[in-house]
């Protein structure tokens, strides 16, 4: 919230939070000056449907889609609006993502055919379609490993840490996610 401008809207789509998470939500959503909207909807095995539903809840001109386990670099947040203003023809930005996994072994790396750089980042830059114009022609496709379609022009942000999302998890969560994705 400290990097959010007063006119910015935050829309949280919750598909299965526990009471502890709800207590955190509760601290923020009741203060209308925060401009936070909380919407609940079951995942039902399709990430694109979930993200398209989320898009329908957003009222701004642009959407910055951040997964619950991602944190944007403060430079990225501070410069999004000037980036968009300076490039009026771009409708979609690919954001590089820094993935780190606690407990990752050589066996995991080989099994999943991952690349690890000298900083321990997994598959960097792992660019994700995360900043995009809020319009009906831009929609998410595919139930898992979803992709946006419909943008007339896109651009990649620089593959530098200051333009990244941080995405950290433990190996147990990664293994659980891999099983879920394989089942969809």
Positions of predicted regions on the chain:
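The conserved acidic donor/metal-binding loop of glycosyltransferases
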Residues: 67-71
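Catalytic-site signature of metal-activated, phosphate-bearing donor transferases
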Residues: 48-55, 73-184
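Short aromatic/hydrophobic "clamp" motif used to bind/position activated sugar donors
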Residues: 63
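Conserved residues at the C-terminal ends of beta-strands
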Residues: 13, 66, 96
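Solvent-exposed polar/charged
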Residues: 2, 56-57
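Acidic donor-binding segment of Leloir-type glycosyltransferases
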Residues: 2-40
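Short, acidic/glycine-rich phosphate-metal binding loop used to engage nucleotide
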Residues: 40-47
């Amino acid at each position: 919230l400290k990097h959010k401008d007063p006119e910015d809207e935050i829309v949280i789509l919750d598909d299965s939070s526990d009471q502890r998470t709800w207590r955190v939500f509760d601290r923020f959503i009741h203060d209308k000056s925060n401009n936070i909207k909380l919407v609940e909807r079951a995942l039902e095995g399709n990430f694109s449907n979930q993200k398209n539903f989320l898009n329908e809840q957003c009222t701004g001109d642009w959407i910055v889609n951040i997964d619950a386990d991602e944190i944007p670099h403060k430079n990225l947040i501070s410069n999004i609006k000037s980036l968009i203003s300076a490039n009026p023809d771009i409708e979609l930005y690919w954001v590089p993502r820094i993935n780190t996994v606690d407990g990752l072994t050589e066996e995991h790396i080989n099994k999943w055919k991952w690349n690890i750089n000298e900083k321990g980042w997994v598959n960097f830059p792992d660019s994700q379609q995360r900043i995009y114009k809020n319009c009906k022609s831009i929609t998410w496709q595919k139930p898992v490993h979803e992709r946006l379609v419909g943008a007339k022009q896109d651009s990649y942000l620089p593959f530098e840490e200051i333009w990244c999302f941080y995405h950290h998890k433990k190996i147990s969560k990664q293994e659980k996610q891999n099983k879920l994705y394989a089942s969809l």
